[in-house]
Amino acid sequence: MKIIKGKKCDWEMIIGLEVHAQVISNSKLFSGASAKTYDSLPNTQVSLFDVAMPGMLPLLNQYCISQAVKTGLALSCKINNYSAFDRKNYFYPDLPSGYQITQFYYPIATDGKVVLEESNDKEVRITRIHLEQDAGKSIHEYGKTYVDFNRAGVALMEIVSEPDLRSTDEVAEYLKKLRMILRFIGTCDGDMEKGSFRCDANVSVRPLGSDKLGIRSEIKNLNSIRYVVQAIEYEANRQVIALENGEELIQNTLLFDVILGETRVIRNKEDAHDYRYFPDPDLFSLEIDDQYISEVKLSLPELPIQKRDRYIRDFKLNKYDADILVADRDVAAYFEEVVQKHDAKLAASWIVCDLFARLNKLGISINESAVKAGDMIQLLDLIVDKTISGKIAKQVFAIMFESGKSPISIVNEYGLKQLDDGDSVSVIVENVLANNKDKVLQYKQGKEKLFGYFVGQVMKETQGKANPELVNSIIKEKLQE
């Protein structure tokens, strides 16, 4: 809980979130038009139904139902056997039919939860998950407004939480956890920059210790977790100042100005009756039987927290590494392919430290990496069988990442194979000791830290290719003579 220090008393935030998650699907919710619209030219992924041409009827995409059921199960929801679609009536240029098809009365899923481990295992209740159409997009340029209907009709899951959140830290954790789960089960890509994971935040404040809910404001269409946090903090503080100054709050719908860092009113908040909801007469109700729910449940992958706990239990990984490896489904798959051939801790270290450092620097995903799981396996093979040293492996990996070449070809091309010939290493050690007689004398007089200096000189002479264990052994032997 975050306490806001007021002039008259302490206040607490009351926050509920409505997340609009775009369903991963080839086609839209009620038409055959493509749902992959982000990079498309305006109005090129549009069917006659999407722009409400007369006589066009909706045809329900069953795959979107499956995706919503899968999401509900992953969030511990009750999947309702009966569900139906309704019309939400309002007028806006990017809504050509004058209504949005949604699920007001009978959502697909209810009564779920998300557990926030970093917030003392706090449970945030999920009120409902329902399917609905996305609207088009209004583009304002040069004093004119254009409408792109590519997005119109794309399937959204609206995931509504109870007002259980009490701080922006909890909000950020909730959104990250929810996004991770949806990505992992393959129902939403969670890309906030592309608008496929958007958030509306309902914010109110009340005196600390009160159980009465205050007048809330709804902040619409927040498309980054950072902006969600900034918007909520600004709005909560604005409400506290207003209340302490004796002002009466009005239920409003707000936008967040990311440049000014403040909220502004776009309209008075509507209630349900303002939208005149009624059942859509063009769509049958849904009967979702228990057998279908069981089949969808069987298709669920191992969820991130379950997978993380298994990594910690079976592979003895620390929580930090395990959390990183399960944060993305593709990363977990990469790790599991490598760990079939190599020690889990060795694999995790190379993926989390070396691979991720380069991926993050370039801002690319693991699927875009030139170093595939098979290449990582080969590199670790070379380390384990002592073909190359760990130090040389770092050089090999850097070249692999830049060129896409296999590790063995790089080792052969650059002559990086580890020097294991005892006689050759012995000659180099003798030369190093002969050139540092004063340090040898100091070592024998008790300055044992110089041992590392001798090792470093030998590795320098061999350009890091000498077997470190062999070097240590021979130096010890020579210093005892």
UniProtKB/Swiss-Prot annotation:
Residue ranges that the Swiss-Prot or TrEMBL entry lists as coiled coil: none
Annotated SMART domains: GatB_Yqey (SM00845)
Keyword ATP-binding tagged: yes
Catalytic activity, EC: 6.3.5.-
A matching Pfam family: GatB_N
Major enzyme class: ligase
Gene3D superfamilies per record: 1.10.10.410, GatB domain, N-terminal subdomain
Any one GO BP annotation for this protein: glutaminyl-tRNAGln biosynthesis via transamidation
GO terms, molecular function: asparaginyl-tRNA synthase (glutamine-hydrolyzing) activity; ATP binding; glutaminyl-tRNA synthase (glutamine-hydrolyzing) activity
Entry keyword set: ATP-binding, Ligase, Nucleotide-binding, Protein biosynthesis
InterPro entries given in the database record: Asn/Gln-tRNA_amidoTrfase_suB/E (IPR017959), Asn/Gln-tRNA_Trfase_suB/E_cat (IPR006075), Asn/Gln_amidotransferase (IPR018027), Asn/Gln_tRNA_amidoTrase-B-like (IPR003789), GatB (IPR004413), GatB_C_1 (IPR042114), GatB_Yqey_C_2 (IPR023168), Gln-tRNA_amidoTrfase_suB_CS (IPR017958)
Keyword Manganese applies: no
Family, similarity comment: Belongs to the GatB/GatE family. GatB subfamily.
Record HAMAP family: GatB
Subunit structure and binding partners: Heterotrimer of A, B and C subunits.
Task of the protein: Allows the formation of correctly charged Asn-tRNA(Asn) or Gln-tRNA(Gln) through the transamidation of misacylated Asp-tRNA(Asn) or Glu-tRNA(Gln) in organisms which lack either or both of asparaginyl-tRNA or glutaminyl-tRNA synthetases. The reaction takes place in the presence of glutamine and ATP through an activated phospho-Asp-tRNA(Asn) or phospho-Glu-tRNA(Gln).
PANTHER family membership: GLUTAMYL-TRNA GLN AMIDOTRANSFERASE SUBUNIT B MITOCHONDRIAL AND PROKARYOTIC PET112-RELATED, GLUTAMYL-TRNA(GLN) AMIDOTRANSFERASE SUBUNIT B, MITOCHONDRIAL
Protein name per UniProt: Aspartyl/glutamyl-tRNA(Asn/Gln) amidotransferase subunit B
Biological source species: Ehrlichia ruminantium (strain Welgevonden)
Gene: gatB
